[in-house]
Amino acid sequence: MHPMIPAEYISNIIYEGPGADSLSAAAEQLRLMYNSANMTAKSLTDRLGELQENWKGSSSDLMADAAGRYLDWLTKHSRQILETAYVIDFLAYVYEETRHKVVPPATIANNREEVHRLIASNVAGVNTPAIAGLDAQYQQYRAQNIAVMNDYQSTARFILAYLPRWQEPPQIYGGGGG
């Protein structure tokens, strides 16, 4: 983040923004999708086993091979869905932690209001030391917010590197004639 970004800019964005609720909702939907895909894979595995007990021959071997490749992909895919949910959950957690570390907008607003009040009543420079102290405190708020956001940015990038690489489902038909 640029070192001259006002402290209140960062605070307002993180406090007034949409928050992490949409991330948490997405992670929950992914867990539901994982459960569905996982149950489908288990059910198909059971059906395939039953079918192989009763159906023998070259066509059953071809079908078992195709179904097996698809089931392997579906099983891996369902795990990837769950891994994605975990990554998104962690992103939501990191966002909330960042929000708690950013200086609240009201704190910054109070600082600025007090500076303006002291400036308005600064007869003969009586309030100059207090104004300087509040300005120094404001600079600390800015530095804190920038450091927190820089940490958030690098942590989010690190977490996103753990998103799984999605693979296409396998081709289950080789195109042979018969």
UniProtKB/Swiss-Prot annotation:
SUPFAM superfamilies documented for this protein: PE/PPE dimer-like
Pfam families xrefs: PPE (PF00823)
Gene Ontology annotations of biological process type: response to host immune response
Disulfide bridge map: none
Family, as annotated: Belongs to the mycobacterial PPE family.
PANTHER family with a match to the protein in the record: GLUTAMINE-RICH PROTEIN 2
Protein name: Uncharacterized PPE family protein PPE59
Organism whose genome encodes this protein: Mycobacterium tuberculosis (strain CDC 1551 / Oshkosh)
